[in-house]
Amino acid sequence: MNIQDAYNEWSEIYDSNINRTRDLDAKVTRLMLNGRRFPSIVEIGCGTGKNTEFLATIGDSVLAFDFSEKMLAKARQKVTVSHVRFAWADITQPWNCPPASTDLITCNLVLEHIENLNHIFAQAARTLRRGGWLLVNELHPFKQYGGTKARFERGADIVEVDVFIHHISEFIHAAEKNGLKLLKFDEVWHADDMEKPPRLVSFVFVK
């Protein structure tokens, strides 16, 4: 199912259905960023605002993008503080952000839906200030190799969303090509699947 239609439909149950990857991503985001403060944050793929709520507590200004209008509608209901702004965006196109304007960019469970990683890293590098961070959390490619992908239930049916497999080296090479250095890296398991491949891969790159 194409990405925009899928997430518009998924928005109705995204916050309530069982989703270990969503829950683990929220936990890892908080662990990676807790204790730091950022004057300006751009969130790529904010969804229903599951991480926006947290980002609002560590950022003086937050701009949150998403490709799904219905996901954005949920996020706007959830996060109403004045220093958070939501906007529709197609991140495969040039981003509507001034150069060197942002201290933190977060990209959570988004890049499996993007074919060209280089464009994303190029736009992030252009938007970040010197010393700024790019946090990327993604479904681990080991899970993808086994057939796992973004999906949700529609009654008795399972709806799978269009995805692309990106190896860990692809993230690192795309970052290096655009002048970003790897600062932190982790592979993360959910408590329910400790004997299985890691569920998430997490990177922090710095400009």
Predicted segments, located by residue:
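A short glycine-rich, Lys/Arg-flanked "PGG" loop and its adjoining helix->strand segment in the class I
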Residues: 118-130
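Short alpha-helix
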Residues: 163-185
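A short acidic, Gly/Pro-enriched loop at the edge of an enzyme's catalytic core
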Residues: 96-104
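Core SAM-dependent methyltransferase catalytic element
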Residues: 192-207
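Conserved class I S-adenosyl-L-methionine
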Residues: 1-36, 50, 54, 71-74, 135-162, ...
